[in-house]
């Protein structure tokens, strides 16, 4: 008989709406002694069946639900079905945008909690961030090797969130032979160098793909300041779109070296591109003091809030950096500003930028609201999957 997790009265409502998390404070009792990652059934207080998921006793999220179908078993075929469904849901996008790099599995939003898989050319990069994902590692790799026989499989589970599951950080080759780094992927006719062993996240920010293309609409003949540029891909799109000048700013010299490489592999001259290894906050203040201005500024900072206790500080950080950026823009200029903090509500982010405009004594108009690329879907019952928020503002 399956191990059974009974919820407290009233705590079944989120699962009935198909939210996949069961928190420790919502559990009434546990029938049996589940092992870490073991499949368990979740029932309401009155005993009716709700879902089947993976147990993680050390985590605040003690069950992540794999399925809400009572007849569905969690086995090799389950993972194969989920991966095939996810691939089918992306095939049109891949053809439309000529993608050789994309997110194949977006964790909970693709029905595989704690599992992220990105495909970069002939390498699949996995992040296994939950106990259930970790326990099923060999099965997941076996299925991927069957479905993508020409791909190496590499793990990038080198993230702090695994500690919350009682898991150690880990990375390394899981299957096949890893090609020489960097790989070259393509999107929208643009080539991008990616190192899956050393790059941020799984190697690259695939989620900003659509926003890079949107930014390119505003840059022809303009001066562009690309802040927190990483490997310079907003600047790369800008160069291809005919920007007059581009300044790529990042604290990492390695990232800037890759930005230079990206220009070369696309056959673009970087005579009008400046690469600046600098702290963005300090540099923006310096430019303000010097009276320097730009036509277009991209602000794509790292996550400012990892938990709710950091949200107030994150709000101050976002307001400060947006205020200074607004002061650097020429009248009629454009600010593209982002938050990748999942805890930051979109409406609050817009309010922060509006308040920053007041402090900067600039009038702005929001002309577009941006989000993550469509290979990063948001499950209808999983609003936490909506993490990337962006705004395009015209500045006067």
From Swiss-Prot:
InterPro entries: PUA (IPR002478), PUA-like_sf (IPR015947), PUA_sf (IPR036974), RLMI (IPR023542), RlmI-like_PUA (IPR041532), SAM-dep_methyl-trfase (IPR019614), SAM-dependent_MTases_sf (IPR029063). It is found in: Cytoplasm. Keywords: Cytoplasm, Methyltransferase, RNA-binding, rRNA processing, S-adenosyl-L-methionine, Transferase. Pfam families: Methyltrans_SAM (PF10672), PUA_3 (PF17785). Its main location: cytoplasm. The keyword Membrane does not apply. GO terms for cellular component: cytoplasm. Residues 2-79 form the PUA domain. It catalyses: cytidine(1962) in 23S rRNA + S-adenosyl-L-methionine = 5-methylcytidine(1962) in 23S rRNA + S-adenosyl-L-homocysteine + H(+). Its EC number is 2.1.1.191. It is an enzyme of class 2 (transferase). GO terms for molecular function: RNA binding; rRNA (cytosine) methyltransferase activity. PROSITE patterns: PUA. PANTHER family: RIBOSOMAL RNA LARGE SUBUNIT METHYLTRANSFERASE, S-ADENOSYLMETHIONINE-DEPENDENT METHYLTRANSFERASE DOMAIN-CONTAINING PROTEIN. Specifically methylates the cytosine at position 1962 (m5C1962) of 23S rRNA. Belongs to the methyltransferase superfamily. RlmI family. This is Ribosomal RNA large subunit methyltransferase I. It comes from Shewanella oneidensis (strain ATCC 700550 / JCM 31522 / CIP 106686 / LMG 19005 / NCIMB 14063 / MR-1). The gene is rlmI.
